Amino acid sequence: MLRLDTRFLPGFPEALSRHGPLLEEARRRLLAKRGEPGSMLGWMDLPEDTETLREVRRYREANPWVEDFVLIGIGGSALGPKALEAAFNESGVRFHYLDHVEPEPILRLLRTLDPRKTLVNAVSKSGSTAETLAGLAVFLKWLKAHLGEDWRRHLVVTTDPKEGPLRAFAEREGLKAFAIPKEVGGRFSALSPVGLLPLAFAGADLDALLMGARKANETALAPLEESLPLKTALLLHLHRHLPVHVFMVYSERLSHLPSWFVQLHDESLGKVDRQGQRVGTTAVPALGPKDQHAQVQLFREGPLDKLLALVIPEAPLEDVEIPEVEGLEAASYLFGKTLFQLLKAEAEATYEALAEAGQRVYALFLPEVSPYAVGWLMQHLMWQTAFLGELWEVNAFDQPGVELGKVLTRKRLAG
């Protein structure tokens, strides 16, 4: 199970009891919007969407020839799939992400791919994302040049069910198109076809992933003392005066998860609230143990302006013993131990050291890095974010602050 540890935050159980009415009201307000047009709460229902799961599997089975999968998308259209695929790719299919528009890496990729064995997936909820459409245009030209009329078999679209340029293009060309539900925003779409389609080609256990997400739904709706997302939302709410929220994951397989969380947290909660005040904390990604040799110095001796969350696996799926090496007696304390024992010791030591330094820190313990556990964790973090939106009195499901940049970009290109 996903387990919250607040041993270095004394008084939290009492705070949970004291703020119970506030949390219950936040949950009530959130759930009251469920089913309303424009509520953007459709992500709550994704773990139950068995029809989409079947559709994704049928498409995967019909295309066994794929050796390279190119996902063209940015933001929520790429961060979730990238985080999950990096953790659970068991198929040998190679994945490439065009979540940028830098020409040199794209040209390098085009020179290395075999178009006959490449599937391109263009992903955009709105269907009008500039970076996605630009990348699609480049790859479309490449596919047509190498494959002629067979190019359509090598392109699949994931977008709005009915609207937008990408949907219209897919219908005009007769392309296979998967639907992102109308009430699911990009950064909440990892368990929609945005994530499920690439994960099917990665050979991941989709049933376990969605089962874990269903468990997160169950805990979100549980009584207060059992509701993990309400508890972690309260932790962030009580520390909202600290401007920095560090999200540090002790798993190389989950190395892209912090970037996914940064978008989820920052784009959802960095807003002007209903009283006209600027609110939000800045999420900072970190990866253990690598960042013990980079950011932890700052975390230990820098400003006490942070709330840190450590995500720590409790057990490995498989392990390696560290053998004894003659001449390396300085490392004898490692001999006979396993790599996971070292990882766990470093995580626990960092957890304690940060608390000793006066930083506010808590941990989320995963049973292991499995599809079930990570599905639970990601859905948990979506609930946490939604609850915080209610506590901070902001709409966690829009992003008005990014629109001006889009307008100015178009203006420069048109000029």
UniProtKB/Swiss-Prot annotation:
Q: Name one Pfam family in it.
A: PGI
Species of origin: Thermus thermophilus (strain ATCC 27634 / DSM 579 / HB8)
Q: Which transformation does this protein catalyse, written as a reaction?
A: alpha-D-glucose 6-phosphate = beta-D-fructose 6-phosphate
In terms of domain of life, where is this protein from?
Answer: Bacteria
Active site residues according to the UniProt entry: E267, H293, K406
- Read off the InterPro entries from this record: G6P_Isomerase, Phosphoglucose_isomerase_CS, SIS_dom_sf, SIS_PGI_1, SIS_PGI_2
Membrane-spanning intervals of the chain: none
* Pathway named in the protein's UniProt entry: Carbohydrate biosynthesis; gluconeogenesis; Carbohydrate degradation; glycolysis; D-glyceraldehyde 3-phosphate and glycerone phosphate from D-glucose: step 2/4
Top EC class of this enzyme:
isomerase
The record's subcellular locations are: Cytoplasm
Gene Ontology CC entries for this record: cytosol
Q: What does this protein do?
A: Catalyzes the reversible isomerization of glucose-6-phosphate to fructose-6-phosphate.
Its chief place of residence is: cytoplasm
Instruction: Give the family per the record.
Output: Belongs to the GPI family.
Q: Which GO terms describe its biological process?
A: gluconeogenesis; glucose 6-phosphate metabolic process; glycolytic process
Show the Gene3D superfamilies listed in the entry: Glucose-6-phosphate isomerase like protein, domain 1 (3.40.50.10490)
GO MF annotations for this entry?
carbohydrate derivative binding; glucose-6-phosphate isomerase activity; monosaccharide binding
Q: What is its EC number?
A: 5.3.1.9
The identity of this protein, by name, is: Glucose-6-phosphate isomerase
Q: Which UniProt keywords apply?
A: Cytoplasm, Gluconeogenesis, Glycolysis, Isomerase
